[in-house]
Amino acid sequence: QTFVAGAFIVLLLAAMYRLRGVNAEEKKLRPVLLAVLIAATALRIGLAATNTGYETDINCFTAWGQIAANVGPANFYSEGFCDYPPGYLYVLGLQGLIGNLLNLTPGSAAYLVLLKLPAIASDAAICYLLYRMGCRAGKPSWALLAAAAWAMMPAALLDSAMWGQIDSVLALLILLVLDA
């Protein structure tokens, strides 16, 4: 739980840091965007803690994270079943290490939040990126509307916070490329 709170604070500080140096209309919208980010992230954390998710994937993510944490990435694919490429397994391995360090019980609310945290953080980053991209197009109020729509879109809430899917991680990477 401490890790979740710390990650949430870091995410908020990063968002606030990126919001500096903007025009007058954007400056007026900052508190609203921050409120949207806080509300959306808090809602996702609450949903993540209270929903088991898509059990097959959650169980696989848990097992793969613990295996990666115990045997390391070099020996991960030597035994057992895994249908994920190596990239995200580094994230799962880190989650397994954190879960072990914090003595979290797999399946507990805290462990569920830990597993879903990369997707939740990606959702928040997508929200901010949509806002930033819209502001660059010269439409801060429309940018805020797009960010808020993403933040509270039921499909995004269901996918990341409730089911524990990581589609938003890839979506974030695609948006970062488009924003570059």
PLM ranges: what are they?
Residues Q1-G46, C135, A143:
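Start-transfer (signal-anchor) and selected internal transmembrane alpha helices
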Residues T2-L11, L117-A125, S168-L173:
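Membrane-embedded alpha-helical segments of multi-pass membrane proteins
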Residues A40, A146-A151:
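Short helix- or helix-capping micro-motifs
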Residues D57-G87, L94-T105:
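Extracytosolic helix-loop segments that constitute the early lumenal/periplasmic catalytic or substrate-binding loops
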Residues S78, P85, K116, L129, ...:
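Catalytic cores of eukaryotic secretory-pathway lumenal/extracellular enzymes that build
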Residues V113-G138:
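Transmembrane-helix motifs of polytopic, lipid-linked glycan transferases
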Residues L129-R132, V169-A180:
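Specific aromatic-rich, kink-prone transmembrane helix
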Residues A161-D167:
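Short acidic/glycine- and proline-prone juxtamembrane loop motifs at membrane-interface regions
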